[in-house]
């Protein structure tokens, strides 16, 4: 892997040296500056010259930018209104504080593809998000404001369960599709960015069915999701290795876990203990230590899975964890613009309010109305991507 990276860097540097600059501005310096800019500024610079465009669209530059972008993450929200998707991005440094605060946001709207009715999203994986509506899969790059509708994986599959994975070694995204509510021993896989946008059949020795409410989680090149295995008749975690396209089965630490939430806790997969949460005031996380040995460890926290604020009559649910280790709570009925962050070890909550998401001015100017917004999608730890769909 290290030799591959060195080779790519040499090719990238040779290409820049062979190019004839239109000014005396050093290209190495230009690249370093571009790598530090937000994606909307980088996209604008593609129009400066053919040379600058070739730098920005170079695969090695894109991968390097995405690697650096992973340290400049944001909290992304979006909701659908008519044929538009309203998008709100809150940079990490705006909410990365030890106290309650107010934060500014970056917002925009995009026109939706015709197939985009009432979609189910994946998590944000290395800058991309997948939506699926019945048997239609739509890939979205919020940074580039691009949508890509993929060909249907199978005519006989009327509804799908969709996962998005990323291979950090080769820098490739892959979409994984399974038939919804059907037991099978194969899936369809499509590699994004390849010349041929076609599906491949990948077999698995574990005949299984994914749950209706499962949310996949991609961690370090492996996609995890909850499934029911046919031959053992038990619920388990299925893992899909994005690079090798190999499936494995991981035993659950216990049956009573929340099937609609899996989180990335300190770079490892974690499940929430449902029984412990219902019987106690806190949260117990089961953290995957060794997938091959089916080994899990547990941690208890005072923070609750659902936070009920009686003063504001709002209920917020645990949706993820920031890279700083804070639990992220999002309101289930969005009327006011705020997010709760919790230090789980100290059980200390702080509220960050965001002006401009569903405030009066925004509602009036966009015809949203005064009611609660129920289908507000949120994506913690979203990073920017220059990948063109």
Curated annotation (Swiss-Prot):
Please give the PROSITE patterns that the UniProt record associates with this protein.
Answer: FBOX (PS50181)
- SUPFAM superfamilies referenced in this protein's UniProt entry, alphabetically: F-box domain
Q: Where along the sequence do coiled-coil regions lie?
A: none
Q: Which Pfam families match?
A: F-box, FBA_3
Q: Where is the F-box domain?
A: 19-65
Organism per entry: Arabidopsis thaliana (Mouse-ear cress)
Q: What's the protein called, per UniProt? A: Putative F-box protein At1g47790
Which PANTHER family does the record cross-reference, listed alphabetically? BNAA05G37150D PROTEIN-RELATED (PTHR31111), F-BOX DOMAIN-CONTAINING PROTEIN (PTHR31111:SF119)
């Amino acid at each position: 892997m290290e030799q591959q990276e060195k080779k790519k860097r040499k090719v990238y540097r040779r290409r820049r040296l062979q190019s004839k600059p239109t000014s005396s501005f050093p290209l190495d310096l230009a690249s370093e500056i571009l790598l530090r800019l937000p994606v909307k500024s980088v996209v604008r610079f593609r129009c400066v010259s053919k040379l600058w465009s070739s730098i920005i669209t170079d695969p090695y530059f894109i991968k390097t930018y995405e690697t650096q972008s992973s340290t400049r993450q944001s909290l992304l929200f979006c909701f659908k209104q008519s044929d538009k998707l309203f998008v709100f991005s809150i940079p990490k440094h705006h909410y990365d504080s030890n106290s309650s605060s107010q934060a500014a946001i970056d917002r925009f709207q995009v026109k939706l593809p015709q197939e985009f009715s009432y979609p189910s999203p994946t998590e944000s994986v290395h800058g991309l998000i997948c939506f699926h509506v019945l048997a239609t899969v739509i890939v979205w790059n919020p940074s580039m404001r691009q949508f890509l509708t993929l060909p249907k994986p199978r005519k006989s599959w009327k509804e799908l369960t969709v996962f998005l994975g990323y291979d950090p070694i080769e820098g490739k995204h892959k979409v994984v599709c399974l038939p919804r509510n059907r037991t099978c021993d194969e899936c369809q896989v499509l590699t994004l960015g390849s010349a041929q946008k076609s599906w491949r059949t990948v077999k698995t020795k574990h005949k299984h069915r994914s749950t209706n409410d499962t949310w996949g989680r991609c961690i370090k090149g492996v996609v995890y999701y909850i499934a029911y295995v046919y031959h053992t008749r038990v619920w388990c975690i299925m893992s899909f290795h994005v690079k090798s396209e190999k499936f494995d089965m991981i035993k659950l630490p216990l049956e009573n876990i929340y099937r609609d939430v899996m989180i990335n806790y300190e770079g490892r997969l974690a499940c929430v203990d449902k029984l412990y949460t219902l019987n106690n005031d806190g949260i117990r996380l089961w953290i995957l230590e060794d997938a091959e040995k089916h080994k899990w460890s547990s941690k208890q926290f005072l923070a609750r899975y659902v936070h009920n604020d009686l003063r504001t009559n709002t209920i917020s649910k645990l949706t993820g964890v920031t890279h700083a280790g804070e639990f992220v709570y999002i309101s289930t009925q969005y009327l006011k613009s705020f997010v709760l962050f919790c230090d789980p070890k100290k059980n200390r909550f702080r509220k960050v309010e965001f002006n401009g998401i569903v405030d009066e001015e925004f509602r009036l100017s966009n015809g949203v109305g005064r009611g609660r917004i129920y289908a507000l999608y949120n994506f913690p730890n979203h990073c920017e991507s220059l990948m063109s769909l």
